[in-house]
Amino acid sequence: MSIATVAQAKDVRGLNLVAAHSHITGLGLEPNSLTPKENAQGMVGQVKARRAAAVVLQMIKDGKIAGRSVLLAGPPSTGKTAIAMGISQSLGSDVPFTSLAGSEIYSLELSKTEALNQAFRKSIGVRIKETTDIIEGEVVEIQIDRSLSGGHKQGKLTIKTTDMETIYDLGHKMIDSLSNEKVTAGDVISIDKASGRITKLGRSFARARDYDALGADTKFVQCPEGELQQRKEVIHTVSLHEIDVINSRSQGFLALFSGDTGEIRPEVREQINTKVAEWKEEGKAEIVPGVLFIDEVHMLDMECFSFINRALEDDMAPIVIMATNRGQSTTRGTDYKSPHGLPVDLLDRVIIIPTSPYSPDEVKQILQIRANEEEVELSPEALEILTSIGADTSLRYGSNLISVSHMLAQKRKASSVGLEDVKRAYSLFLDTARSVQFLSSSNNYVGEDGTAKLGEREKDAMDTSA
C-alpha cells in the first residue's frame, strides 16, 4: 500500500473572520515550564485548570498517554472550550486534533457509532517514513522542441549544483509539469524520480537582481551543494480515517475532497490496522496518538457512551477531551441522574479538570483582548461598564456587546467606543436575566398548551433606561 501526500500552502488573506476563540494561540505557559502565566497567548486566569491541562499537553507531546479521557467541567462562560483550543494550538499541525460537538453525531446518513468511529480514527495519525531518490539543483536552461505536426513535445533540462552540472532529456509529461509549476531559469527545484513530481523550492541568490519584478511570495535560496541525485527520507503524516477512505472501494480517494465518506466496512478497517501494525514492526511507520475534543458531551446518549468506553480500551485510541457545563443531570437515553450527565462507568475512566467563574479583573482583561482582536478601541469608561455587564450577566454577552457598540460608534462618526454606545447597545439587546423578567411580565407569548392571550396591553413596560 503506497500513500502519497502533497502539502500545499495557499494564501487566505481574503478570509479574515473573528471567531469566539480566534484570539487564543496557546495555553499561555512559561517557557520550558508547565507554569501558566496570568495573561498570555489570549488565556487569562483559570491557573489551576491550565496547569492541569499543561500536564496533559506535555504527556501528549511525549507520547506517554493514549486511550485516556479528560473531562473539563464547569459553569458556562468559564473557558472550557478555550482551554481545549489552547491545547490544540500548542500541539502544532503534526499531531491530529479533531473537534466535535455532542449533537454532530446524530445524522440520517451515518449511524451514531460510525460517526464516532470516524472521529476517533481522524484523531489517530500515522507518521510514515519513505526513502525516495530526488534530483535537486538550480535550473540553468530549459529547451523545448515542439513538432510542427503536433506530435509529442521533447526537450532538455540543464540543472546544476555548486559542484556539477547535468543535462536531462524531457518527455511531454515532464514538460507539462514544468509549465504548470512555471519553472524558469534560475529556479531551484526538486524532482521526485519515482513519481516525477516537481517542487519549486525558490529562486537562486545568483539570479537576484534589483530590477527584477518579483512577487511578495518569492523566496531566495542557496544553490544546492554536492551531488545532483540524492536519497532523502520523506515523512508523511496521515490519519487512519484518510487511509480508510482511500482504501474504501465504494468511495475511493475522491471522497476525501467531497467529504461524503459514508459507512466504511469493518473489514477495511481491520485490514488497515493489520497493515499499519506491520509497518510499525518494520520501522516504516509510527503511531501518533492525537486528540479528540467532544464539546457538550452531555448531548450523547447511552449507546455513544458505551462505544466510547470500548474505544478507549483499544490499542490505537486517541486522547479524548470532553467538556460539559452540567451538574447533576439526566443521562440522555435513561431516566436516572448522574454527575455531569455522564454514566458512572465512564466517569470512573476520566480525570476531571474543574473550571471556576472569572473574577471581575479577569473579565476586564478578556474583554480588552477581545476588543484588540476585533480591532475596536474602547474608552476607559466603556471598558469599565462592559466589565460590570460581563460580571453581572455573562462573559459571552459582554463580549457580544463589543461589536454592537462599535457599530453604533461608527454611526456617530466616533473613533472609539464610548459610554453612551455601550448603554445604547445594552438597551437594544437583552441578556438572559432581563429576557426572563420580560417573559414573566408578558402574557402575549404562546404557552406550552399552544394558547396565548392576544390583544391585551402590557401593564408594565419593559425598562430599557439602564
UniProtKB/Swiss-Prot annotation:
Keyword annotations from UniProtKB, A to Z: Activator, ATP-binding, Chromatin regulator, DNA damage, DNA repair, Helicase, Hydrolase, Nucleotide-binding, Nucleus, rRNA processing, Transcription, Transcription regulation
Biological process (GO), any one: regulation of transcription by RNA polymerase II
Enzyme class: hydrolase
InterPro entries documented for this protein: AAA+_ATPase, P-loop_NTPase, RuvB-like, RuvB-like_C, RuvBL1/2_DNA/RNA_bd_dom, TIP49_P-loop
Source taxonomy: Eukaryota, Fungi, Dikarya, Ascomycota, Saccharomycotina
Record localization: Nucleus
Record function comment: DNA helicase which participates in several chromatin remodeling complexes, including the SWR1 and the INO80 complexes. The SWR1 complex mediates the ATP-dependent exchange of histone H2A for the H2A variant HZT1 leading to transcriptional regulation of selected genes by chromatin remodeling. The INO80 complex remodels chromatin by shifting nucleosomes and is involved in DNA repair. Also involved in pre-rRNA processing.
GO cellular component, one term: NuA4 histone acetyltransferase complex
Family as reported in the entry's similarity comment: Belongs to the RuvB family.
Pfam family, one: TIP49_C
Binding site for ATP: G74, P75, P76, S77, T78, G79, K80, T81
Name by which UniProt lists this protein: RuvB-like helicase 2
Domain of life: Eukaryota
Subunit structure: May form heterododecamers with RVB1. Component of the SWR1 chromatin remodeling complex, the INO80 chromatin remodeling complex, and of the R2TP complex.
EC numbers, comma separated: 3.6.4.12
A GO molecular-function descriptor: DNA helicase activity
